[in-house]
Design a protein with these regions (language model features):
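Solvent-exposed, non-transmembrane regulatory segments of membrane-associated proteins
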Residues: 4, 12-16, 20, 26, ...
């Protein structure tokens, strides 16, 4: 049987237990019926990102025609297991600093009316 390698990337919040993240990701792959047992799934810690710690779940499957469904199933499982283990998937946050204008809108309207 011929296998193809696939990947799912995910970011977790800084401060997360990286060993637990690895364990959860492997569990998610190992428990899907279409993920090959050999070669075994693996996890790479791929990045210290701007908002998250990056991980990559690598796994093999012979079922190329259903792979998007398999990846979706695994992502749902990852989300559920992360919630159970208090592992957060962050999202970028931006701070906006609005500078006030010294001229009020009322003053501008009055000047335009003249």
């Amino acid at each position: 049987m011929q296998y193809t390698r696939f990947r799912i990337t995910v970011g977790v919040a800084y401060g997360s237990d990286t060993k637990l993240v690895k364990e959860v990701l492997l569990d998610c792959a190992n428990n899907h019926e279409y993920v090959a047992k050999r070669p075994k799934p693996s996890v790479r810690f791929i990045d210290f990102g701007e908002s998250s710690l990056g991980f990559e779940l690598l796994f093999y499957s012979a079922n190329m025609f259903r792979i998007e469904r398999v990846k979706s199933d695994i992502r749902f499982y990852i989300d559920a297991k992360f919630r159970q283990n208090n592992i957060h998937i962050p999202f970028p946050q931006r701070d906006l600093h609005i500078k006030s204008n010294s001229v009020s809108i009322k003053d501008d309207v009055t000047k335009d009316s003249d």
